[in-house]
Amino acid sequence: MLTRKQHDLLLFIHNRLSVSGISPSFEEMKLALDLKSKSGIHRLIKALEERGFIRRLPNRARALEVIRLPEDKTEIQKKISRDYTPPKADNDVIEIPLHGRIAAGLPIEALEGQSHLAVPPSYLGSGAHYALEVAGDSMVDAGIFDGDYIIVRQTDEAHEGEIVVALIDNSDATLKYFHREGRMVRLDPANRAYAPMRYDASRIGIQGRLVGLLRRY
């Protein structure tokens, strides 16, 4: 029998593979399960392998294959989203607000326009969520590409090293790794072609943290 965290991770991997065909990164899995470190993800992956639910594909980075799912898959999906129930769309997906585009490069004007994006229920944990379309290439080394859709859990707090939606001077939004340096905030890209950005903490507002990603082909 799987633990709750093992169930949650298995379904997160399964739904990511079903939607995009790409395994989530360890960072994405850590954020989705709200764990403090990637070591916890490594332990969960190992446990799922040992129980015959997943296997690693040799000679391929970030390559996981789901071999089987637990019989109580439906019940677990209900538990994952029990604290937040947005309006449902067809085909077992949930619609969340799509707030325009977010810069993965230089900051751009924040959160213009709104429509909706349909996502699998297992992408969403507790709390309110929204989606943004990525513009730019500054986060490519984190597996986030121009045109991707990111799933964001709405929060005004950020932990060290998380990927966040940061609002600069209440006008420009950007997607970056979050770091504190005393009274300053450093926003790091995941592309060596871009330099880190540093601001006084009073100029930065956290709009949410990354919990998932969708890619359309």
From Swiss-Prot:
The active site is at S138, K176. The keyword Transport does not apply. The lineage of its organism: Bacteria, Pseudomonadati, Pseudomonadota, Alphaproteobacteria, Sphingomonadales. One of its GO terms (molecular function) is serine-type endopeptidase activity. This is LexA repressor. Its EC number is 3.4.21.88. InterPro entries: LexA (IPR006200), LexA-like (IPR039418), LexA/Signal_pep-like_sf (IPR036286), LexA_DNA-bd_dom (IPR006199), LexA_repressor (IPR050077), Peptidase_S24_LexA (IPR006197), Peptidase_S24_S26A/B/C (IPR015927), WH-like_DNA-bd_sf (IPR036388). Disulfide bonds: none annotated. HAMAP family: LexA. It catalyses: Hydrolysis of Ala-|-Gly bond in repressor LexA. Represses a number of genes involved in the response to DNA damage (SOS response), including recA and lexA. In the presence of single-stranded DNA, RecA interacts with LexA causing an autocatalytic cleavage which disrupts the DNA-binding part of LexA, leading to derepression of the SOS regulon and eventually DNA repair. It is an enzyme of class 3 (hydrolase). The record marks A104, G105 as: Cleavage. Gene3D superfamilies: Umud Fragment, subunit A, Winged helix-like DNA-binding domain superfamily/Winged helix DNA-binding domain. Signal peptide: none annotated. It holds the Pfam family LexA_DNA_bind. Residues 26-46 bind DNA. Belongs to the peptidase S24 family. One of its GO terms (biological process) is SOS response. Keywords: Autocatalytic cleavage, DNA damage, DNA repair, DNA replication, DNA-binding, Hydrolase, Repressor, SOS response, Transcription, Transcription regulation. PANTHER family: LEXA REPRESSOR, LEXA REPRESSOR-RELATED. Homodimer. NCBIfam families: lexA.
